[in-house]
């Protein structure tokens, strides 16, 4: 029978302080710093508001990662923390052990106490020192007190905690700086989004993700705020379309008002668009406004014309491109020259290439192989879902011999795997898959390689062949 070890003295002290809020407040300046993380977490979960307010004033670390405790936000607890910060901001002389410089409200997966684990809590101290030493991108200088938040707008109205925080920060401008680096929009009406943006330092925002279906006219209302995000690095757009009711002249004006904002974005590097249709025939307008070299271009399931692809291949901003993703962009009837030119521009830097489900045929593949074989940094190549014969696939594999950094390869099942009606012949697919694997192993030793069929019309899953065949779900 095992005997439970007696509680450590620190644990006994913590339990006593949680039971007696008055004692906790009166002894705060004398508490060992090792007690602060667990005591604060318990006080926050039990909503001991006066204890929270006092603990913030005496916090012995430079960073308070409150975001990890805000999974289920409580307004009164948040108010208590902010009231503690208010006291610090107005004090000429801080309490002896008080070191707080950063209130971090970002939604992270860290466990609050794990952040401070270790005998000396040296890890969070080092982390917080880095965060306070770095200049905020929106200010160009170090601030006396920083509040970090990420904005995720997914409800029709702002929740009360975020509303209170933004109003609180706005009223204390000059005493502290509220820094938001990431903005995500999932479903909030545009007038509410604009209300939020008017309370945020837009210079700080580095990443924007819009994950809700917008009309082009709505995007245009958002665009002027985008142009004020001078340090924006990444923009992700989903499901933006132009209504058929918009007259062509108005559509052109709307597109110009959106694309002209990129003239103000000197640090923009990552363009990601998914199911976006309004730029068909107008991509050149956006490309002409780019001010910096792009690292990533993602345009999946987008409507693009051949001239759009040509303009992309001519764009000087793609010469240092690391990722190109054109999944679901139909290239079947395009000349291979724009894609060849695009790869040529990025041949020295390209690391990820995704041409899945582009409808590429043998002749187009043959044209891009010479430049593809020179993409020496390529580590991920996805090409499944294209209409490629066995002979063309074997030729493709031979052209990958010099690509020593390839670690993930996804290829289509050969056309010969299907019958005349387009149905998969399972035995034939397995036979050809084994043959292709043997061909590749004679050339080099692959790391991860998979041959995939088109999606099953019934279950939507691709059958695959890597070391052995794998059926769909039917």
From Swiss-Prot:
<keyword id="KW-0433">Leucine-rich repeat</keyword>
<feature type="repeat" description="LRR 7">
    <location>
        <begin position="323"/>
        <end position="341"/>
    </location>
</feature>
<feature type="repeat" description="LRR 2; degenerate">
    <location>
        <begin position="177"/>
        <end position="201"/>
    </location>
</feature>
<feature type="repeat" description="LRR 5">
    <location>
        <begin position="265"/>
        <end position="290"/>
    </location>
</feature>
<feature type="repeat" description="LRR 4; degenerate">
    <location>
        <begin position="229"/>
        <end position="264"/>
    </location>
</feature>
<dbReference type="GO" id="GO:0008284">
    <property type="term" value="P:positive regulation of cell population proliferation"/>
</dbReference>
<feature type="repeat" description="LRR 9">
    <location>
        <begin position="375"/>
        <end position="399"/>
    </location>
</feature>
<dbReference type="GO" id="GO:0005737">
    <property type="term" value="C:cytoplasm"/>
</dbReference>
<dbReference type="GO" id="GO:0031462">
    <property type="term" value="C:Cul2-RING ubiquitin ligase complex"/>
</dbReference>
<feature type="repeat" description="LRR 3; degenerate">
    <location>
        <begin position="202"/>
        <end position="228"/>
    </location>
</feature>
<dbReference type="InterPro" id="IPR026271">
    <property type="entry name" value="PRAME"/>
</dbReference>
<dbReference type="InterPro" id="IPR032675">
    <property type="entry name" value="LRR_dom_sf"/>
</dbReference>
<feature type="repeat" description="LRR 8">
    <location>
        <begin position="347"/>
        <end position="374"/>
    </location>
</feature>
<dbReference type="GO" id="GO:0043161">
    <property type="term" value="P:proteasome-mediated ubiquitin-dependent protein catabolic process"/>
</dbReference>
<feature type="repeat" description="LRR 6">
    <location>
        <begin position="291"/>
        <end position="322"/>
    </location>
</feature>
<protein>
    <recommendedName>
        <fullName>PRAME family member 7</fullName>
    </recommendedName>
</protein>
<dbReference type="GO" id="GO:0043066">
    <property type="term" value="P:negative regulation of apoptotic process"/>
</dbReference>
<feature type="repeat" description="LRR 1; degenerate">
    <location>
        <begin position="97"/>
        <end position="122"/>
    </location>
</feature>
<keyword id="KW-0677">Repeat</keyword>
<comment type="similarity">
    <text>Belongs to the PRAME family.</text>
</comment>
<dbReference type="GO" id="GO:0045596">
    <property type="term" value="P:negative regulation of cell differentiation"/>
</dbReference>
<dbReference type="GO" id="GO:1990756">
    <property type="term" value="F:ubiquitin-like ligase-substrate adaptor activity"/>
</dbReference>
<dbReference type="InterPro" id="IPR050694">
    <property type="entry name" value="PRAME_domain"/>
</dbReference>
<dbReference type="GO" id="GO:0045892">
    <property type="term" value="P:negative regulation of DNA-templated transcription"/>
</dbReference>
């Amino acid at each position: 029978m095992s005997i439970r070890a007696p509680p450590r003295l620190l644990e006994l002290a913590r339990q006593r302080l949680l039971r007696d809020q008055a004692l906790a407040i009166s002894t705060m300046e004398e508490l060992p710093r090792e007690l602060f993380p667990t005591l604060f977490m318990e006080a926050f979960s039990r909503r001991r508001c006066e204890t929270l307010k006092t603990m913030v004033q005496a916090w012995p670390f430079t960073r308070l990662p409150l975001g990890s405790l805000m999974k289920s936000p409580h307004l009164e607890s948040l108010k208590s923390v902010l009231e503690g910060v208010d006291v610090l901001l107005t004090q000429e002389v801080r309490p002896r052990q008080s070191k707080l410089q950063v209130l971090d409200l970002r939604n992270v997966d860290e466990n609050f106490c794990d952040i401070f684990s270790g005998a000396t809590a040296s890890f969070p101290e080092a982390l917080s020192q880095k965060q306070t030493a770095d200049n905020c991108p929106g200010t160009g200088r170090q601030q006396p007190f920083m509040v970090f938040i990420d904005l995720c707008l997914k409800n029709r109205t702002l929740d009360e905690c975020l509303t209170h925080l933004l109003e609180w920060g706005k009223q204390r401008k000059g005493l502290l700086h509220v820094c938001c680096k990431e903005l995500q929009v999932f479903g909030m009406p545009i007038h509410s989004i604009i209300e939020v943006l008017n309370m945020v330092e837009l210079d700080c925002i580095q990443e924007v993700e819009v994950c809700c279906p917008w009309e082009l006219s709505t995007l245009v209302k958002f665009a002027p705020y985008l142009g004020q995000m001078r340090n924006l690095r990444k923009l992700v757009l989903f499901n933006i379309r132009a209504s058929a009711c918009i007259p062509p002249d108005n559509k052109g004006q709307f597109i110009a008002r959106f694309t002209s904002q990129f003239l103000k974005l000197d640090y923009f590097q990552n363009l990601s668009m998914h199911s976006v249709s309004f730029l068909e025939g107008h991509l050149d307008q956006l490309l002409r406004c780019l001010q910096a070299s792009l690292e990533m271009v993602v345009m999946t399931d987008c409507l693009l014309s051949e001239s759009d692809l040509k303009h992309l291949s001519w764009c000087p901003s793609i010469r240092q491109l690391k990722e190109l993703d054109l999944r679901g962009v139909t290239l079947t009837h395009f000349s291979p020259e724009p894609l060849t030119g695009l790869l040529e521009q990025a041949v020295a830097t390209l690391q990820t290439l995704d041409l899945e489900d582009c409808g590429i045929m043998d002749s187009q593949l043959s044209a891009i192989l010479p430049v593809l074989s020179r993409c020496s940094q390529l580590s991920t190549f996805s090409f499944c879902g294209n209409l490629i014969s066995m002979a063309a696939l074997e030729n493709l594999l031979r052209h990958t011999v010099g690509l020593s950094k390839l670690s993930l390869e996804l290829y289509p099942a050969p056309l010969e795997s299907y019958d005349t009606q387009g149905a998969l012949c399972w035995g034939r697919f397995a036979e050809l898959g084994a043959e292709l694997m043997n061909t590749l192993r004679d050339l080099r030793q692959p790391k991860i390689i998979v041959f995939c069929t088109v999606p099953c019309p019934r279950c939507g899953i691709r059958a695959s062949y890597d070391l052995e065949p794998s059926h769909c779900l039917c």
